[in-house]
């Protein structure tokens, strides 16, 4: 009786220890768990009729509908969304036998894969396919609690998320706008550079032509000056020659007049006439020679005059060409002024481009600062997530330790139970041995008693 009482105490102690371990394990999810009525009310708020009785005795189709609503709300995924991919996968796997797996089961399996990702994000790491097909009250309370808390957390952080999202969208839109403006400015700058290069080539060509025309103009001016000097010199020589010719002609006329006057006197003396004739012949020859020379000189002067006329015409053509060149030079000056204005406009555009580049750099720096702030917020969120993960890991370690302690205690209990069973067996054997020894001792006692009685009887007979 005492032994059985001790065994019952040990059994009650193991049950209490097992209950404490289970209680510590459940305390890990105590902060996340919600009452049944609150869960049913939240599901009713989303438009799905649901009661606490439905949670206690769950219907798989109803539970799948609730899960589908949460998946559509948080991930925009439904049965219809996964159907094309699952049908294509079934065609690839099944080949000529696509109906091996029913369509509903196939879509439910694909929906389960997407839903498991959502559960992992919500903190439910042990979500299984059985939770969809054969849900239980305890599992549904845990899963719905995590889901509802996740949705509440998301709704509570919606302004912050929207604010950062709107800021990032505005920054992105501003970047796109600045990038488009930058591209437009670069195109305009490239077009201006092309125009500048084309204008520079034209300006260089015009400058080269201008230099050539200036050199030719200077040469023509020098030639004109030389021709003008030659013309003046020839005109002066012509005037002088004409004067000399007139003088010679006048002398010849006077000489002839004198000859006519002296002719009567020459008839008086043959010798004197002969002498006079000889003298006159000589004078005549000299005069003829001079006249021939004068005629030659006149012809030369006429030739020079014709040459001067041709040269004068050439000079007039050169003057006209110079006028054309001056007009071209004026046009060149206009082109140069226009090119200078274009250069000024290009420099102004370059200044505008530099201002745009400075604005772009400023916006890039602002973008970098916003990115740094976003990165800081992301790091803070990551640090918080890491802290939560670390806390979760600590809780998991504690849970693991508790499980190990529980397993160790269970093993210890098992060893003690085995020892107790062995001790009980030994005690039973010992009891049996004692009882057999008592029985044998009793038999021996009876035998000795019978022997003693027999001996006493024989002693009495002998007496």
Curated annotation (Swiss-Prot):
- Provide the residue span(s) of the region labelled Disordered: 1-29, 330-357
Return the Pfam families for the record: Nuf2, Nuf2_DHR10-like
Q: Which residues form a coiled coil?
A: 166-455
Which cell locations does it reside in? Nucleus; Chromosome, Centromere, Kinetochore
Q: Where is the composition biased (Polar residues)?
A: 1-14
Task: Please give a single GO biological process term from the UniProt record.
Answer: cell division
- The answer to whether the entry has keyword Cell division is yes
Q: How does it assemble?
A: Component of the NDC80 complex, which consists of ndc80, nuf2, spc24 and spc25.
Family to which the UniProt record says this protein belongs = Belongs to the NUF2 family.
Q: Would you tell me the protein name for this molecule?
A: Probable kinetochore protein nuf2
Query: Organism source for this protein?
Result: Aspergillus oryzae (strain ATCC 42149 / RIB 40)
Gene name of the encoded protein: nuf2
